[in-house]
Design a protein with these regions (language model features):
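Extended, low-polarity transmembrane helix blocks
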Residues: 1-167, 177-248
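Transmembrane-helix motifs of polytopic, lipid-linked glycan transferases
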Residues: 170-174
């Protein structure tokens, strides 16, 4: 049913981009907590989801299977050649180890899965806004500060601590074993970006950049792992089936 509205993806994406510029512009963006702020934020995310759905439907359009923009030889090698699996292997192991250890420490330590006290303290420090002339706040974007404040107000640290700990462990194990590397790296990027938005730098920028590389090289990054056998069996389920006309 949505296929007939595929042509709306581009104009809706432009509208979402305009709203994003409006939201992040210090001269225009309304203060956090106002109705205007809420409407702009909700509109942006609704449009983003709609555009993604329409883009997914676009794979069914005529000619979608034959559009192929050829890239430079080195990118084809890094992202499509199985020999590049050796290049991605140490990166995958490094990231997997970092995520797995971080998740394990949260599961076996205190303050994360036993009520989320450590996580609550982290959130409370992140949302603080110092007085004028006393430095910059940890969080740059008001919408992310509002999101963390919403979690604090709803006492979400209990279940969110479990979510972070298990998520980090799952990403780590997936990368170490080479299981669905692209998906594991994507969720790793989401967690790294969340820490960066909250004002925590540490190793997150490095891990973020390396995980982006694994996402781009998802076809071969897990070649020396389970993906070598798993991906050929799974195929790519999001790709539209090619209909071959019968011979007359």
């Amino acid at each position: 049913m949505l296929a007939r509205y595929r042509y709306l993806a581009t104009p809706l994406a432009l509208v979402a981009a305009v709203i994003l510029v409006y939201m992040e512009n210090p001269w225009f963006f309304p203060k956090a907590g106002t109705t205007e702020n809420l409407v702009a934020t909700v509109a942006f995310w609704v449009l983003t989801v709609v555009v993604l759905v329409l883009m997914f439907e676009d794979r069914k359009s005529p000619g979608a299977e034959v559009v192929d923009v050829e890239g430079p030889a080195f990118t084809r090698y890094l992202f499509s050649n199985t020999r590049a699996g050796l290049f991605w292997l140490p990166i995958r192991i490094f990231l997997g180890f970092e995520f797995a250890v971080a998740g394990w420490h949260k599961l076996t330590g205190t303050g994360w899965i036993d009520g989320g006290g450590a996580l609550l303290g982290y959130w409370q420090n992140a949302v603080k806004v110092p007085a004028a002339g006393q430095g910059s706040p940890p969080i740059t974007f008001d919408w992310y500060r509002s999101f963390l404040q919403l979690l604090i107000d709803n006492h979400a640290q209990g279940w969110f601590g479990w979510l972070i700990a298990l998520g980090e462990l799952a990403v780590g194990v997936g990368l170490l074993l080479g299981v669905l590397v692209g998906i594991a790296a994507f969720f790793g990027v989401v967690m790294n970006m969340s820490y960066l938005l909250a004002g925590t730098t540490s190793v997150n920028p490095v891990m973020f950049a390396l995980a982006i590389g694994l996402i781009l090289g998802w076809k071969v990054a897990g070649y020396y792992g389970v993906d070598r056998y798993l991906l050929p069996r799974l195929g790519v389920p999001w790709r539209a089936k090619v209909v071959i006309p019968a011979r007359s």
